[in-house]
């Protein structure tokens, strides 16, 4: 019986080998699970636990087998340690890379956030600048509009003032023109009235002279001899004496005519004063044409003397003298003296 339970050398190595293999499998499984699910920890020295199973075999082969298994286990544990170190370094590298990536992501996020903030700040600043620019443009437009309105108001007021001034000047000018026109019309009327009056006086004098001439012709025929004897006299006194003999009516009428005609042609000079007098000698032909006029006694004022001579010469011709008998004309009017006075004219 005792020999029946005694094992062969191969049987005595079988179970230790199986146990060693199982042990290695368990160790590798535990290492794999530990590596797969273990949290990231700082590297630490691996702890290898070895279990030594005392086999009941007392044979040298069993001892050698156990030693071989132990050596294999130790070798296996050493390789496992290297694997774990490599994996640990790999994990640490991955962790560093992950941290670096996270830091980069954080930095990128911060940069993006900063960029976004900068863009927002820039947009806000641009918006504020545009608002300020728009406000300034609005104020400038309002100021420009106000200035334009001010200038327009000034121009309008200036135009109104100029219009008022022009209206006042036009009114003043019109009033002056009206006054001047009225004065001219009044002067014209006065001159016309005076001219009409003088013309009427001349016509009356002509009629009177014509009547007197007719009477003189009749009287001259009666006193022809005596009148001819007196023709040689050239003094004023003798002229007046002869006129008295021939008839004061004849000489008076012609003298009035001469006075009226000369008065119409006389233009009073500025230097003429009342009380002044000048005597002018008039020379005529039988047809009444005035051939000469000269000063026979001066007033002492040359302009006044010249105005008297010019008035006589401007008469030109007195046709009424043709009505006188030749003898009467020669004795009284071939040379006739006239006295000019500023206030009147007398012969």
UniProtKB/Swiss-Prot annotation:
Q: Which GO terms describe its cellular component?
A: plasma membrane
The GO biological-process annotations, alphabetized, read as: bacteriocin transport; cell division
Periplasmic-side segments: 38-347
Entry GO MF terms? toxin transmembrane transporter activity
Q: Where is this region: Disordered?
A: 112-219
Q: In which broad location class does this protein mainly occur, judging by the first location in its UniProt entry? A: membrane
Q: Which residues lie on this side of the membrane: Cytoplasmic?
A: 1-16
Keywords (A to Z) from UniProt: Cell cycle, Cell division, Cell inner membrane, Cell membrane, Membrane, Repeat, Transmembrane, Transmembrane helix
SUPFAM superfamilies registered for this protein in UniProt: TolA/TonB C-terminal domain (SSF74653)
Query: Where is this gene product found?
Result: Cell inner membrane
Q: Where is the composition biased (Basic and acidic residues)?
A: 112-206
- As recorded in UniProt, coiled-coil segments are none
Give a short account of what the protein does. Part of the Tol-Pal system, which plays a role in outer membrane invagination during cell division and is important for maintaining outer membrane integrity.
* Protein name, UniProt field: Tol-Pal system protein TolA
What is the native source organism of this protein? Pseudomonas aeruginosa (strain ATCC 15692 / DSM 22644 / CIP 104116 / JCM 14847 / LMG 12228 / 1C / PRS 101 / PAO1)
Which gene name belongs to this protein? tolA
């Amino acid at each position: 019986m005792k020999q029946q339970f005694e094992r062969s050398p191969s049987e005595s190595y079988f179970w230790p080998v199986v146990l060693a293999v199982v042990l290695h499998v368990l160790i590798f499984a535990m290492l794999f699970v530990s590596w797969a699910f273990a949290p990231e920890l700082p590297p630490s020295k691996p702890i290898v636990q070895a279990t030594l199973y005392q086999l009941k075999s007392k044979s040298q082969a069993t001892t050698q087998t156990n030693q071989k298994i132990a050596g294999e286990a130790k070798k296996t544990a050493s390789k496992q340690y290297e694997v774990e170190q490599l994996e640990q370094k790999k994990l640490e590298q991955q962790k560093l890379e992950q941290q670096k990536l996270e830091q980069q992501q954080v930095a990128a996020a911060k940069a993006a956030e900063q960029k976004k903030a900068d863009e927002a700040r820039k947009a806000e600043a641009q918006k504020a600048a545009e608002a300020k620019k728009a406000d300034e443009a609005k104020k400038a437009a309002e100021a420009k509009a106000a200035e334009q309105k001010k200038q327009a108001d000034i121009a309008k007021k200036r135009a109104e003032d100029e219009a008022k001034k022009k209206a006042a000047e036009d009114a003043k000018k019109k009033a002056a023109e009206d006054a001047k026109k009225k004065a001219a019309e009044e002067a014209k009327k006065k001159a016309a009235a005076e001219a009409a009056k003088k013309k009427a006086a001349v016509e009356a004098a002509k009629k009177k002279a014509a009547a007197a001439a007719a009477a003189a012709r009749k009287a001259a025929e009666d006193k022809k001899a005596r009148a001819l004897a007196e023709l040689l006299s050239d003094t004023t006194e003798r002229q007046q004496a002869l006129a008295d003999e021939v008839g004061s009516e004849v000489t008076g009428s012609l003298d009035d005519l001469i006075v009226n005609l000369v008065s119409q042609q006389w233009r009073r000079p500025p230097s003429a004063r009342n009380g002044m007098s000048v005597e002018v000698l008039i020379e005529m032909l039988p047809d009444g044409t005035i051939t000469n006029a000269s000063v026979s006694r001066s007033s002492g004022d040359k302009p006044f003397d010249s105005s008297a001579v010019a008035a006589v010469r401007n008469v030109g011709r007195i046709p009424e003298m043709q009505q006188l008998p030749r003898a009467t004309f020669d004795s009284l009017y071939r040379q006739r003296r006239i006295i000019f006075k500023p206030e009147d004219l007398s012969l």
